[in-house]
Design a protein with these regions (language model features):
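Membrane-water interface regions at transmembrane-helix termini and the short interhelical loops
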Residues: 54-56, 83, 99, 107, ...
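C-terminal membrane-solvent junction of multi-pass transporters and transport-like membrane proteins
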Residues: 384-461
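Membrane-interface "cap" regions at the ends of multi-pass membrane proteins
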Residues: 1-61, 196, 218, 222-235, ...
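Hydrophobic alpha-helical segments and their helix-loop junctions in multi-pass secondary transporters
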Residues: 124, 128-133, 186-220, 235, ...
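Juxtamembrane transmembrane-helix boundary signature
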Residues: 67-100, 109-124, 288, 454-460
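Hydrophobic transmembrane alpha-helices that form the core helical bundles
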Residues: 105-144, 321-337
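Membrane-interface loop-to-helix entry segments
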Residues: 158-210, 264-270, 371-384, 441-446
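Transmembrane alpha-helical segments of multi-pass small-molecule transport proteins
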Residues: 36, 109, 137-169, 183-193, ...
Length: 461
């Protein structure tokens, strides 16, 4: 009975985990416009926008930093990830397995899946802050690491179960859900900004500039928070999705695209989500701080509800949902690379359970900026290996892929990963929080892979 129920849900889902996407399964532009708009106009926006306010960024630094950083992110998706995805039409995980060997990629896939679980978990927690409003749940604060009440745990687990139910149905359902929800959420964010500005006393263009500079983004961090500058904003907006574009995780999504140019459609997500929505949620947080002076409570649901009422709370629920859905889907595909004989939907269901448990801990939300930086630092190096392998082979340098020589553990790739990660964390430690400096190590990693290819080619002469 139970198996029949799940078979009915997942149907004949085929996610092509180890084969190229056939032509009849390719998706048009609408699918990607909706999914990226939904994913990036989502739960993280209700966290990141307020955290910029808390870190004391100025209004001018925020606007200019977001314009530059988001442009760099779109170019990374369009010029790096898109061409590789539509050329190979394979998942990130299977491509890495072919290059680096099954045994090495198993460890990478495990780390990748855990990172995705934690990110999706933070979004489930964001949704739970809104679901808990009618039940008067005690909400987490900026310093909380552990859940405060059993009610919070129950709310999170229920949200996680519902979100997982959509994710196990595969890419089609994930994309369909985002297409339905994203237009409404975008309008809610815009409405939030307008209503919030009115509550802060904005009546004209002059008062808008004054309120933005003196009330919302006044350049003064909250107690216990570090100071952010324009460089933090540029590099964070560029690299907050580094694992997706430079780290190549979105090969898994863009392999369905009819054209490599669909990678540029991410502009809909990043400029609506990582520009409009971050600004709007920052305005909401400023309204919340004005009404609750000195409050350390940090609950996106409460923040949105105070300004927009029920519509704001519902938007937070849906926003967390539209981010968690594709993230759990990606995590399921990562683990499917470790357990290739297990159906993806079963693995995704297990991932959803792990994610829901992780979501019970508010620290995932409170430390989201740090987590996103760590997430990118850990997952980016293997993207450099795929990038180097693709472009070197395209330019006549034969690639030494593990699958061709039946190598289970490509030592050179492991060394590249170790050198790159060590260099990254060395910089981060030396600068005490320099989380946005991964470009140089990516070059180091690519050069290491190039050297390995040349060395192997010479040894065959």
């Amino acid at each position: 009975m139970e198996n029949r129920f799940f078979k009915k849900i997942v149907g004949g889902t085929n996610e092509y985990e180890r084969t190229p996407i056939p032509a009849e399964s390719l998706k048009g532009r609408k699918s990607f416009l909706g999914m990226y708009a939904g994913e990036h106009t989502a739960g993280t926006e209700f966290v990141i926008g307020p955290l910029f306010v808390a870190h004391g960024v100025t209004a001018s630094d925020l606007i200019l930093g977001l314009l530059i950083g988001n442009l760099l992110a779109v170019l990374s998706w369009g010029l790096i990830t898109g061409p590789i995805a539509t050329s190979k039409r394979l998942t990130l995980y299977y491509q890495l397995e072919r290059i680096a060997g099954k045994n090495l990629v198993r460890w990478y896939n495990l780390v990748n899946a855990l990172m995705f679980c934690f990110l999706a978990g933070s979004m489930i927690a964001v949704s739970a802050t809104a679901v808990g409003i009618p039940f008067d749940l005690e909400m987490p604060t900026l310093s909380d690491w552990l859940p405060r009440t059993p009610g919070w745990i129950v709310t999170v687990l229920v949200m996680g179960a519902v979100i997982t139910l959509v994710a196990i149905q595969g890419y089609n359902q994930v994309s369909k859900f985002a297409n339905i929800m994203s237009p409404w959420m975008i309008l809610i964010f815009i409405a939030a900004a307008i209503v919030g500005l009115a509550q802060l006393g904005v009546r004209s263009a002059e008062s808008l500039i004054s309120v933005a500079q003196e009330v919302i983004w006044n350049g003064v961090p909250l107690a216990g928070m570090s100071k952010f500058t324009i460089w933090h904003i540029i590099f964070f907006s560029w690299f907050c999705n580094m694992a997706m574009h430079i780290g190549m995780s979105d090969l898994t999504i863009l392999r369905y695209a009819k054209s490599w140019k669909y990678g540029f459609y991410t502009f809909v997500g990043v400029y609506l989500g990582h520009f409009v929505a971050w600004i709007a949620s920052g305005i909401l947080y400023a309204v919340f701080l004005q009404a609750n002076s000195g409050s350390q409570e940090f609950a996106p649901g409460q923040i949105a509800y105070q300004t927009l009422g029920i519509a704001g709370a519902v938007c937070v629920v849906i926003a967390g949902w539209t981010t968690a859905n594709p993230t759990i889907y990606r995590a399921g595909l990562a683990l499917q690379g470790i357990f290739p004989k297990v159906p993806t939907w079963k693995i995704t269901a297990i991932v959803g359970g792990i994610t829901s448990l992780a979501a019970c801990f508010p620290a995932l939300v409170m430390k989201l900026l740090d987590f996103v930086a760590l997430y990118g630092l850990l997952l980016m190096p293997m993207g450099a290996v795929i990038f180097a392998d693709f472009y070197f082979s395209e330019n006549g340098l034969p690639a030494r892929r593990s699958i061709e020589f039946e190598i289970g553990f490509q030592l050179a790739c492991f060394a590249e990963l170790g050198i790159d990660s060590g260099f990254l964390f060395g910089i981060k430690s030396a600068l005490r929080g320099g989380n946005f400096l991964p470009r140089t190590p990516r070059l180091v990693c690519g050069c290491c892979h190039f050297r390995n290819c040349v060395q192997n080619e010479v040894s065959d002469l």
